[in-house]
Amino acid sequence: MSDDLFSKALENPDQDLNVELPKDDVDLGLLGDGGNERKTDEPAADAERSTGLGSGSSESESDSGSDSDSDSGSSGSEDDSADQDVEGEDEGGDAIENEDEDEDPSPSGPILSKNEILEETVPELPEDYEISEKTIITPIGVLKSAFENNIIIHATMSGEKRVLKEGSIFCLEDRTLIGMLTEVFGPLQNPFYRIKLPDSKKNLFDELKVRLGEKAFIVTPDAHWIDTFELKRNKGTDASNGYDEELPEEEQEFSDDEKEALFKKMKKQQQQRKKRDNRKLANDSDNVKVKRARQPKANSLPKLVPPLGMSSNAPMQHGYKSRNARENIKRESSATSNRNGSSPVPITQLHQQQFSANNYPFPQQPNGMPYPPYSPFPQPTNFQYPPPPFGQATPAQFSNTVPYGSLPPAYNNMSPPTQQSFMPMAQSQPPLPYGVPPMNQMQNPMYIQPPPQAPPQGNGNFQQVMELHQILLQQQQQQHQYQHQHQQDPRT
């Protein structure tokens, strides 16, 4: 743009050019004296520039040189003022820093943490403490080293079972007092004991330092022991955090950003997994509570009804009968017999089931052998022999041709029953169900089952039934007697 103005001025030197120069937005008041000088120079430069337009190119060149000189001078003045301001600010900042340093003086000595102890407390024995000749002392190790008022004793006894506890008293063989135990360290097989001496016992430390290698003893009454398994339970650490604890996870620092990101990701996953597990446990507990609430109460459950044969009030049926049911049946039968006024009925030894020790229904033979067993139901015809012993011939079968109501011919040769008892029905045992064996037969497997009793058909026919039963028993006795005689004499 400046080239166009100069070319126009050269072409028309007599013509005035109305040129609007750009305004400077910089606040010259902040620049100090240089700004004022620039303000005074600007009108003069404008006048010279307007007068120089009519005087040729040489004058314009001189004007441009003067303008450049003025601009350089003004810029130089501005730079000087800016440098002065920066130097002033630096001096002010240094002054503020000096004031801060004066307000917070640096602490004297080493920096200590909150729980750090600068000096170790030294346990001291009473001044009048002495080891008499009667006091029992026990060898424990040898003097290993001495440094900075510390005496190290290397134990010769194993500490796998127990070790000395702080506060135990050590001495030499001549009962020279060493001091109290301060620390135990080293392996359990041969631990080390450290004894800290106070500064007031410098002479004792020098004496013990000369006597290194001698045996060390403990005062047995003042020795304190601790079991090793208690030490193994509390595992130590070498961390140097507060209270000698390791840094928590949230305070750990990483030198690698990737490792830190991976650690945070794993920690986040663990937290999410833990929340998921807690939510699952809560849901399970809710389900259990709902299930328990839905369970019916004991009062609303239907009552169990015992089987018909096991109920105390049930009628007599085939099967097991409880004791109460049997007693009730017995009472009912006795009451009905008393009301009917029935006469005593003779009952043989077979019905009493008490006439022999071996519970056989028939009398013993002279040789002590019982009768052979027979079928539980009476067979009116075609009685068969039992299987004969090995090597004997089978006898021929015979049929029962004795008419009803008459006694067989061999009945006269039979011996009468040895004993009969007449007992009223009220005192007899109640009849068992049809086909059920008596209790002593259940208990004794060798018991021969008697013929089943026919169910009662009324009080009028009961005596006839009993007489018929007696006849059947006599016939069976005759049959068994004949079989027994035939087995003893097979030639007949």
Curated annotation (Swiss-Prot):
A GO molecular-function annotation: RNA binding
Region feature (Disordered): 1-117, 237-346, 424-492
Low complexity bias: start-end ranges: 456-485
Biological function: RNA-binding protein required for the maturation of box H/ACA snoRNPs complex and ribosome biogenesis. During assembly of the H/ACA snoRNPs complex, it associates with the complex and disappears during maturation of the complex and is replaced by GAR1 to yield mature H/ACA snoRNPs complex. Acts as a competitive binder for CBF5 probably required to prevent non-cognate RNAs from being loaded during transport of the particle by inducing a non-productive conformation of CBF5.
Domains as described in the record: The central region (136-221) reveals a striking structural homology with the core domain of GAR1.
Encoding gene (name): NAF1
Keyword terms of this UniProt record: Nucleus, Phosphoprotein, Ribonucleoprotein, Ribosome biogenesis, RNA-binding, rRNA processing
Compositional bias annotation for Polar residues: 334-346
Signal peptide residues on this chain, from the entry's feature table: none
Basic residues biased stretches: 264-278
RNA-binding: annotated span: 172-230
SUPFAM superfamilies: Translation proteins
GO CC terms of this entry: nucleus; sno(s)RNA-containing ribonucleoprotein complex
Isomerase among keywords: no
InterPro entries, per the entry: Gar1/Naf1_Cbf5-bd_sf, H/ACA_rnp_Gar1/Naf1, Naf1, Transl_B-barrel_sf
Biased composition (Acidic residues): 60-70, 77-105, 243-259
Compositionally biased residues, Basic and acidic residues: 35-49, 279-289, 324-333
Assembly notes: During assembly of the complex, component of the small nucleolar ribonucleoprotein particles containing H/ACA-type snoRNAs (H/ACA snoRNPs) which contains CBF5, NAF1, NHP2 and NOP10 proteins. Interacts with SHQ1. Interacts directly with CBF5. Interacts with hyperphosphorylated C-terminal domain (CTD) of RNA polymerase II large subunit (RPB1).
Subcellular location: Nucleus
GO biological process: box H/ACA snoRNP assembly; pseudouridine synthesis; rRNA processing
PTM sites of type Phosphoserine: 255
Alphabetical list of Pfam families matching this protein: Gar1
Organism name: Saccharomyces cerevisiae (strain YJM789)
Major localization listed first in the record, in broad terms: nucleus
Protein's UniProt name: H/ACA ribonucleoprotein complex non-core subunit NAF1
Recorded family membership: Belongs to the NAF1 family.
